[in-house]
Structure formats: C-alpha cells, structure tokens
Amino acid sequence: MLRNKVRKTDTLIALNEVYESIQGEGLLVGLPSVFIRLQGCNLRCPWCDQPEALSFSGRKVKLSSLINELKKFTAKHIVITGGEPFAHRELPFIVEFLLSEGYSVQIETNGTLWVEEMEKFAEGIHITCSPKGVAKYYVHPKILKYAKELKFVVDKEFSKEVLKKEEFERFLREGKVVLQPESNRKEMMEKALKIQKELLKECYTVRVIPQVHKCFDLK
C-alpha cells in the first residue's frame, strides 16, 4: 500500500498554475479557494478567458510537489480547473490525495469527457459542469449523473431552449442551474435576467451570478 502511494506521488501533472483566491463563479461563490489550473483542453471556446491553458504542452510537476505547494495556502477548498481536468488520466490521483489530506474538492469541467477511475470519488466532490450554449452540445452521462450544478455562460448566441434539453431537466427542477453573463458585460447581464424571468413563469428558478472575483479585481 505504501509503495503504491509513493508511486502515485511520483505521477507527473501537466500544471499551468496554482493560486489562492475566492471562488467567483457558480453555487459556491465567495468560498476561499486554492485553484489548481491544469494545462490542456479539448475545446476552443471563443470567450475562453484562459487561452494560455489550452495547449497540452507545458511544464509538468510531480504530484508530491503539487501537494507541498498547496501547504503554503490557508484555504482548504480546492478548485481543479483548466484547461479541462477530465482530459487528464492523472485526475483521480490528484483527487484521492487531496481528499486524504482533508481538502474539499471542486472540479470545473466542460462536461464532454470522463475518467472511469473518478467514479469512486465523484459522490464526495463538487462537480461544476459548464455546457456550451448550443443545442447539439454533448455532455457525458457520468458528468450528468454526478454534477452538483450546471453553469452556462450567457453570450450572444446563448438560447434559453438549450436549458430545456431533457438531460438538463433535473438541474432545472432542483434549482441547480446558474446563468453567468459573459465577461460581466451589461448586455449579457440583461439577457440573463430576461431568461431568468421567463423561466420563472414556467416554474423554474435559475440563478444569475456574474464573475464575482472580477468585481473585486481578484484573479
């Protein structure tokens, strides 16, 4: 068992950056958090605010080094973001060690990918799925099963009808849908509020939450 643990700590992680801030998006907004940004994404979203994290090339660090770096921070909530976390086969090792060290774990994902070894941890973490606002967008069934919320970026192309896809109905019914105005732009805030009002008439309550960290000029 100890030998396996040592081997896992030698696992190389494609890491973009680690930093402490507040969670500025979604249902856990305001929570003091340490962000682990993994390097590499399978999508190319036009409004992506982290283009430097898209490529799969870049520095790699041992998991043991990452764990040591986390000890410099005071927050005990970890947000694994990217890039796309589920594009990394090493993700289960990261989550396992974080949970064993007493951290709470949140993963921000575009929802298109899944790593089977994550199933044993999925119930005990907070998965935030951010589907893109187009009708034919695919979300992996396991992500839909374990996600705690759906977060949609409301941009010029976003349509309310996307929210009514059959696979999203549970989240609408349970009030676990967040509309995030693109880049906190005024016209997108107005659009999100309009959609929220229309959905209220259909007995669905969604939340409109801007990128709060940007309001405080935080990372």
UniProtKB/Swiss-Prot annotation:
Its cofactor is [4Fe-4S] cluster; S-adenosyl-L-methionine; Mg(2+). SUPFAM superfamilies: Radical SAM enzymes. Its EC number is 4.3.99.3. Gene3D superfamilies: Aldolase class I. GO terms for molecular function: 4 iron, 4 sulfur cluster binding; carbon-nitrogen lyase activity; magnesium ion binding; S-adenosyl-L-methionine binding. One of its GO terms (biological process) is queuosine biosynthetic process. S-adenosyl-L-methionine binds at residues 83, 130-132. Disulfide bonds: none annotated. It catalyses: 6-carboxy-5,6,7,8-tetrahydropterin + H(+) = 7-carboxy-7-deazaguanine + NH4(+). It is an enzyme of class 4 (lyase). Keywords: 4Fe-4S, Iron, Iron-sulfur, Lyase, Magnesium, Metal-binding, Queuosine biosynthesis, S-adenosyl-L-methionine. Pfam families: Fer4_12, Radical_SAM. Binds 1 [4Fe-4S] cluster. The cluster is coordinated with 3 cysteines and an exchangeable S-adenosyl-L-methionine. Binds 1 S-adenosyl-L-methionine per subunit. It comes from the Bacteria. Pathway: Purine metabolism; 7-cyano-7-deazaguanine biosynthesis. Homodimer. Belongs to the radical SAM superfamily. 7-carboxy-7-deazaguanine synthase family. This is 7-carboxy-7-deazaguanine synthase. It comes from Aquifex aeolicus (strain VF5).
